[in-house]
Amino acid sequence: VKGARELMERLAADGYQVCCITTTYEQYARRLTQRLGLPAEQVACTAFPIEELRARLGDADMAAVDRVEAALLKLDMERDEERLRDLLDAFYWQELPGTPLGEAVATVKPVGGRRKVQALGQFARAWQFDLSRWVVVGDSITDNAVLAAVRDAGGLAIVFNGNRYALERGNVGVASLSLMDVMPLVEAWEDGGLDGARQLISREAKPPDADGPHYHWLAGTDIAEASEVHARFRRLVRQVAAALG
């Protein structure tokens, strides 16, 4: 995402401790975070022993994966959410059990949901920061538990171009083409706590169809308007990424 490298550099320059907690498989997560300047010990991700798993699979297993992948590529991830869920539910819960592929998949433990909260707890203990002093940024259902944990502790739970599962659990939202646009919220929170963040959001309010960034106060509010704005920016970010190849 545009602005990611600049945000990391800014946070480091300002003395922040930064970690990455992601459901992404380790092969991609390590490579990406290394490019952003994060050391491996500050990254929690999903272990995926690819060579070990490949050795357990046959042609029929790989054909099943190819078939589901082809079906997924035909779906719009935003507009076909129910079809996406039904397709994956049928594959994981009906087709895979009892097969070599199913047994291999069962050994993979994604870092999402409660495992993200556990990983955050480990970083918090290592750095001796209470959760009330944390800023967390998330965008999807795999982030909802860690967003809620930081929100409920009094920290800053930022939803960036999030879906409704994340928006329901954050206390603030940012819809933008650049990740750097979370920085004004972080600074407002540092200076004035959650009240400071809320004041910035009020000052920066704009019509839903305006260019970004858009800032939203989410805690205790109807997220319908924010959800529409965030969905628009999710699509825009994906279009930019697709254009870049």
How should each PLM-predicted stretch be described?
Residues 1-2:
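Metal-dependent phosphoesterase signature
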Residues 5-9, 14-17, 24-245:
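C-terminal cap/substrate-recognition subdomain and adjoining C-terminal extension
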